[in-house]
Amino acid sequence: MAEPLLRKTFSRLRGREKLPRKKSDAKDRGRPAQRSEPKPPEPEPRVLEGSQAGAEVPLSPETPRSPARGAYLQSLEPSSRRWVLGGAKPPEEISLGPRTPSSGEPAGEIWYNPIPEEDPRPPAPEPVGSQLASSEPEGPILQGAAPTSPPTKTSRTKSPGPARRLSMKMKKLPELRRRLSLRSTRTSRERERTAPAGSVISRYHLDSSVATPGQASVAGGTRSPRGGYLSDGDSPERPGGPPSPTAFRPYEVGPSARAPPAALWGRLSLHLYGLGGLRPTPGATPRDLCCLLQVDGVARARTGPLRSGPDFLRLDHTFHLELEAARLLRALVLAWDPGVRRHRPCAQGTVLLPTIFRGCQAQQLAVRLEPQGLLYAKLTLSEQQEAPATVEPRVFGLPLQLLVEREQSPGQVPLIIRKCVGQIECRGLRVVGLYRLCGSAAVKKELRDAFEQDSAAVCLSEDVYPDINVITGILKDYLRELPTPLITQPLYQVVLEAMAQGHPSRASLGPEGTRGLLSCLPDVERATLTLLLDHLRLVSSFHTHNRMTPQNLAVCFGPVLLPARQTPSRTRLRGSGPGVSSAVDFKRHIEVLHYLLQSWPDTRRPSETPDVAPYLRPKRQPPLHLPLDGPEVVTRPRGRGGPESPPSNRYAGDWSVCGGDLLPRGRDFLSGPDYDHVTGSDSEEDEDESGEPRGTTDFEDEFDAPFNPHLNLKDFDALILDLERELSKQINVCL
């Protein structure tokens, strides 16, 4: 399998000397093989200095062929036999593994096998007379310009240059690299024991096996016990233990240190080596510890439960954290508290990320923990990114005057406010908890980006944004992020003075008087606030449906429309802290907005709906007149033949007996909608406070919306109760 590669290798090593050797071998094959007696080795003649470069040295008598050649050739395959006959190598020269040079050939000749196909076999036994002293020089020795070896017997010992070049080319073959790396350790040791010290194979294995430099261990400073040579494709051995504590730089952040203004983007690789200095209480049982990593206060990684040791806890954990505008890295050591059955922090340390990576990408730190302990860790910053360029705001956070001039919106009101208010008034006035419930954060982020790109192209239809709470949340976010609040300091003072005069009354102030409070505002702010107050007044008029009274709306929009601190200093409590003053501010905000909503004219109140379906109006039943002149006869209901229907079956029976006065459209009414489409309503509004049934006009006042084709089951329940009450009464029957 490896014959073509072996031939190519030998052809490169021999070069142009192959042809003369073949000719000499052809002459030798014509002579009869003679058995020669073993002779003692003769000293190799040397060439003296000053002799001519082309002078030849007398050759020793030719060595006859061995009789084992024929048996050896018969045992080979045809292809191997042709290759051996072509090279004219005697069987004594063909052996696997290293061998010592025999008589009649140079001392440095080797059998070079660049691809170890099989495990090496022990070398074949050689005649005793062919052994040479190990003190003889290996390879040709040059003195001046004259070679010491005879020219007729060409030496096959080559310098490591061609072998190294071949080795570098063979690195591209992954299969050979794998096989060589698997066999290098075992075969190198065997060659080191069997081959002489001066053998070329013992020094080079494809000329790329270099002895590994001694790596001092961390603990004792001794060499790694695993020795030998590394073949192509091998990597250096991994250190056996963690670095010594002296390799870590002490790091400590003061208690008054603040987060740096700069931020960090990229990927942080954090390797934890151990915890030291955690001195447990004498006599205490070992605790279960874990390490929690936080980036800017957000938990990002956590180790499993670890059993604490006497003084040092060895760790081997690696975490890869994606950083986005990161500033602080905090490591918390948590200990299990069996009393409360949860982990409690027992030590913590902080690292300022932007400062430790100045001029380098990796740091080995011994982070000081408070109140005690050290955390040994290696921090590596890879794939560092530049801070994203700040995008100029186009809608959110932009002054109202600038936004209106850019959009050229009619009425001097931004488009985002007009679109949101229009959608809320169209389909959200009857939603319970309007402006109190929050929508999806992801959908709000998507809608915010759409407004930032192009406010005119945003569509807020129900098909695109079915959740009305997303639109209300976007509107409140926009008002909250305005550089200047809509209710400015001058308007705030005006409203406080109006509140000091007495309870707000629309009759006392009048429509123009209430709107006149906004005259101190600029044109854009006055138009925007007027639109918002009209909208909030309309929302509060539907408080029976959405539960949003003026007080609830003031709680939601007070901190949004007013700045954080506008309470005059004289109203603040003396000696009060910032928490008390902020609570007073929040209360004042609610009172100011509540006053404005109560005194604001309700010009957009929905008109009443006079045309209500006649079959939905409750009609007064005429009194029942019965002749009572005869004697009184008490009757009791007779039992029915079959089992009575359960009381839960409310809707069984024939409704036609009710007559046309009660339900003039009873048949069409009952055959129309299905009960599955019936919606519920509040039962507390069925009767007045006095307990008397409502009149027709009172019932019609409730319908301030278009006719709803859905039915009300509670009206049927009330009707059934009235019928059961009438049927259960005892009546006098005249006989």
From Swiss-Prot:
Residue ranges occupied by any Rho-GAP domain in the UniProt entry: 398-604
Source organism (scientific name): Rattus norvegicus
Keyword Magnesium: no
Biased composition (Basic and acidic residues): 14-47, 669-679
Compositional bias of kind Low complexity: 151-160
The protein's name in its UniProt record: Rho GTPase-activating protein SYDE1
UniProt GO cellular component terms: cerebellar mossy fiber; cytosol; presynapse; synaptic membrane
Residues making up the signal peptide according to the UniProt record: none
